[in-house]
Amino acid sequence: MPENVASSGLKNTNGQDITSLGEALNNAMEIIENDGVFFTPKSLVKMIVSVLEPKSGTLLDPACGSGGMFVQTGDFVNLAGMNANMVMTFYGQEKVEYNSRLCLMNIAVHGLSGKIKSGEEANTYYYDAHNLEGKCDYVMANPPFNVDKVKSESCQNAGRLPFGLPGVNKKTKEVSNANYLWISYFYSYLNEHGRAGFVMASSATDSQNRDKDIRGQLIKTGHVDVIVSVANNFFYTKSLPCSLEIEKTDKRDRKRLNAEWDAKIA
């Protein structure tokens, strides 16, 4: 256990129930942000979960960090009178092994269980570590913003790109900005009735070139449900403004929606 977690309140939890211990751990995560953990404010996580209203099924967070999406979902389901471990299956990918261990500890402290992959095999750009394309009822995530130097050929080979690659640097053959890789992944993981909620850099709402093309294709599906603008300086370690985006799919109706769209613009 990280030393500064133990000194931030956990040592005072003797006699407290597991929920109190979990709350102490959540509070500690705000303190250890400088140790490499990218903490997502609980209010943003809670909003995503409240909008998606998970009840049962498979939940994937392909950039799971310390596991906040799982914990909040567990709380939501349990408060609805169900047992989250009985009705939900949690899957996570987290490349940084320290963060994945913190995630496992976090969900365990909250009485939850999940399948968390870490290390290079959990690099979502290049691997679908749990083989969940098209199988998820829910996808929730706060991925890293504006990542560059992602190998385009490896991304292409890994699939999960229903709208194609975003912009690629012709000289280096690297993806210039990975925001729309993440957005494509979230969409591709959903099953026919899936719902996705995620945090994204606000620049993704009006980025140009291939990003604009992908955004147009996504909007054309009719599955973009809600976009909420989040003000600057909302995160503890980030000053960039961001947005919360919600997708709700019924992919069986995609052909019908496309036909209706084409008729409107004809």
Regions found by a protein language model. Name each.
Residues 1-43, 47-50, 115-118, 123-126, ...:
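Non-catalytic, mostly N-terminal accessory regions of nucleic-acid modification and defense proteins
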Residues 7, 13, 20, 34, ...:
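Intrinsically disordered, low-complexity segments enriched in small/polar residues
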Residues 35-141, 146-148, 153-157, 200-203, ...:
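Conserved S-adenosyl-L-methionine
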Residues 3-6, 26-27, 37, 81, ...:
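A generic structural signal for ordered alpha-helices
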Residues 4-16, 54-71, 218-251:
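Unusually extended, aromatic-enriched hydrophobic runs near protein termini
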Residues 133-266:
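A conserved structural/catalytic subdomain of Rossmann-like adenosyl-cofactor enzymes
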Residues 22-25, 49, 104, 187, ...:
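Residue-level recognition of well-ordered secondary-structure positions
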